[in-house]
Amino acid sequence: MANPKYKRILIKLSGEALAGERGVGIDIQTVQTIAKEIQEVHSLGIEIALVIGGGNLWRGEPAAEAGMDRVQADYTGMLGTVMNALVMADSLQQVGVDTRVQTAIAMQQVAEPYVRGRALRHLEKGRIVIFGAGIGSPYFSTDTTAALRAAEIEADAILMAKNGVDGVYNADPKKDKTAVKFEELTHRDVINKGLRIMDSTASTLSMDNDIDLVVFNMNQSGNIKRVVFGENIGTTVSNNIEEKE
């Protein structure tokens, strides 16, 4: 087997990825399917961390727009990400992968506190680490959490696993049949063109820390493995290609 392109990765999953066809809540069978995909890659010696959104359970911005205090709304969303992390950790444990959940908000009864050195040791020992509760502060997305934690653990790449979306396009392919898919982009392209892959804070963090970002369709079996081994199945964003006009 060829050598992997990425040896330490952070997988960013949306909360909706755990919801299955319903789109809300948590579908255990869907989580178990994702866990098996991750386990297959982990068994090849790849070091893996995860950040999971909370949009299947709660969205802070709409709640704030409806009149809820924005800070409280965001903290509520952080707790949703912890729920998702615990469910995913259980599914990974059930397929034989030693997994730890670390949270940016202390809740010792259910998870470890986030400690960078401890997270690195877990990865080096072959454990998967799931980062929950965002960065512990309101106003920051789980995209920013993914970029920050990827930088802190010195990940080679962030894998943006999307539901039914196979990359980045110049327009919404569901609405525009002429939409063109980008195979490669620079982080600068993403920022300058306003492409909504991640929010601007997350994009800048990824660029400044030279972390590749790969956007791919997670609904096709084996795609995480394909990305890790360098197959060009989605859109790769990095600092190392020629600038696009």
Swiss-Prot record:
Query: Which InterPro entries would you find in this protein's record?
Result: AceGlu_kinase-like_sf, Asp/Glu/Uridylate_kinase, Uridylate_kinase, Uridylate_kinase_bac
Residues noted as binding ATP in the record, renumbered to the chain: 12-15, 55, 59, 163, 169, 172
Query: PANTHER family, from UniProt?
Result: URIDYLATE KINASE (PTHR42833), URIDYLATE KINASE PUMPKIN, CHLOROPLASTIC (PTHR42833:SF4)
Query: How would you classify this enzyme at the top EC level?
Result: transferase
Which GO BP terms sit in this record?
Answer: 'de novo' CTP biosynthetic process; UDP biosynthetic process
Function (record text): Catalyzes the reversible phosphorylation of UMP to UDP.
Pathway(s) this gene product operates in, as recorded in its UniProt entry:
Pyrimidine metabolism; CTP biosynthesis via de novo pathway; UDP from UMP (UMPK route): step 1/1
* Protein's UniProt name: Uridylate kinase
Q: Which residues bind UMP?
A: 54, 74, 135-142
Return the Pfam families for the record: AA_kinase
Species of the source: Streptococcus pneumoniae serotype 2 (strain D39 / NCTC 7466)
Catalytic activity reads: UMP + ATP = UDP + ADP
Coiled-coil regions listed in the entry:
none
